[in-house]
Amino acid sequence: MLHWISLLCAGCLEMAGVALMNQYAKEKSVKWVLLIIVGFAASFSLLSYAMETTPMGTAYAVWTGIGTAGGALIGILFYKEQKDAKRIFFIALILCSAVGLKILS
């Protein structure tokens, strides 16, 4: 169970890293670069730990799914990106797929 928690945290850190890259695109600063590096390094470390007991394909799919869905949600909530029913449906589909992979593992 701890490995799955670390996988969820890894996905959240990937999501944060992508949000930080968006922030860096708006304001070039060493601070953002350092935060991006730390965020992604922590994300990869936790992903590596999770892969000790979780199959690689499952771990990677869940990790990227969290990052993809989370990045889209951050865009909608904080950066005024388009939010329509189709977009929300497919974000939900990504999350349901991650849950399905957890159930199968």
From Swiss-Prot:
Supply the name of the protein: Probable guanidinium efflux system subunit GdnD
What transmembrane ranges does the database entry give? 1-21, 32-52, 59-79, 85-105
Q: Which InterPro entries match?
A: Small_drug/metabolite_transptr, Small_multidrug_res
Record keyword 4Fe-4S present: no
Keyword check for Ion transport: yes
General function of this protein: Probably involved in guanidinium transport. In vitro, confers resistance to a broad range of toxic compounds such as cationic dyes, neutral and anionic antimicrobials.
The knockout note for this entry states: Deletion of both gdnC and gdnD leads to a decrease in the concentration of guanidine required to inhibit bacterial growth.
What top-level branch of life does the organism fall under? Bacteria
Stored Gene3D superfamilies: 1.10.3730.20
User: Which GO BP terms sit in this record?
Assistant: monoatomic ion transport; transmembrane transport
- Tell me how this protein sits in the membrane: Multi-pass membrane protein
Q: What induces it?
A: Transcriptionally regulated by guanidine, via a guanidine-sensing riboswitch.
GO cellular component term of the entry, any: plasma membrane
First-listed, main subcellular location of the protein, grouped into a coarse class: membrane
Identify the SUPFAM superfamilies for this entry: Multidrug resistance efflux transporter EmrE (SSF103481)
Q: Which GO terms describe its molecular function?
A: transmembrane transporter activity
The similarity annotation says: Belongs to the drug/metabolite transporter (DMT) superfamily. Small multidrug resistance (SMR) (TC 2.A.7.1) family. YkkC/YkkD subfamily.
